[in-house]
């Protein structure tokens, strides 16, 4: 875990992205290679810290802070990087929300960018003709389960309100990994093999 000596970070950002890995198989089966996460280390800092579920995303967040970006910038860069290197932990095809507390202004903010129902959706699209609920997984599987993604728009809104670095600097690492590749974890390899055609 990286401990940063970044001064003047006076706010806390909590980012929860909505992601979905739909499967009927238990997770233990997906991890048939026996991947075990690195030993958890405990770290503390008075000024700031970056931690994510993937080391490349953590490095990107640290880089953004070291370039003078704020926690909002780092969270945006981390979110886009996770969409590439660990899609189940963050993706641009979903949505989420951000709860923000700015210590300097003592103001809380919430930005909701959850997925939205498509324009042609109806309130009874998951019901049978008699008005009873259709239990055939229509709301979770297939074309009727699709929502309009909100992640990119939500992260853009965070950037416009609170960001300090240019947008292109925040997404450049995600673009780099998408174009040039990266070493995947055994766990992601297992999932890709399990669901390959």
What do these predicted regions represent?
Residues 24-59, 71-72, 76-197:
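Noncatalytic scaffold domains of N-terminal-nucleophile
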Residues 6-7, 19, 72:
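Residue-level micro-sites within transmembrane alpha helices that shape
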Residues 10-20:
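Bacterial N-terminal signal peptides
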Residues 63-65:
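Long, structured ligand/cofactor-binding scaffold of large enzymes
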Residues 1-10:
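Bacterial N-terminal signal peptides that target proteins for export
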């Amino acid at each position: 875990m990286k401990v940063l000596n970044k001064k003047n970070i006076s706010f806390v950002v909590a980012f929860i992205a909505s992601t979905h890995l739909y499967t009927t198989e238990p997770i233990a089966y997906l991890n048939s290679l026996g991947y075990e996460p690195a030993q958890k280390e405990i770290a503390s800092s008075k000024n700031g810290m970056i931690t994510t579920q993937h080391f490349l995303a953590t490095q990107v967040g640290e880089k953004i802070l070291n370039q003078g970006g704020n926690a909002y910038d780092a969270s945006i860069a981390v979110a886009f990087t996770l969409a590439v290197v660990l899609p189940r932990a963050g993706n641009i095809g979903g949505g989420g929300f951000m709860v923000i507390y700015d210590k300097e202004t003592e103001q809380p903010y919430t930005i909701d960018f959850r997925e939205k129902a498509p324009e042609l959706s109806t309130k009874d699209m998951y019901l049978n003709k008699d008005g009873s609920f259709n239990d055939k997984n229509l709301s979770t599987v297939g074309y009727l389960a699709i929502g309009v993604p909100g992640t990119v728009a939500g992260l853009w809104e965070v950037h416009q309100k609170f960001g300090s670095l240019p947008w292109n600097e925040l997404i450049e690492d995600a673009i780099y990994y998408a174009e040039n590749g990266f070493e995947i974890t055994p766990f992601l390899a297992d999932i890709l093999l399990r669901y390959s055609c």
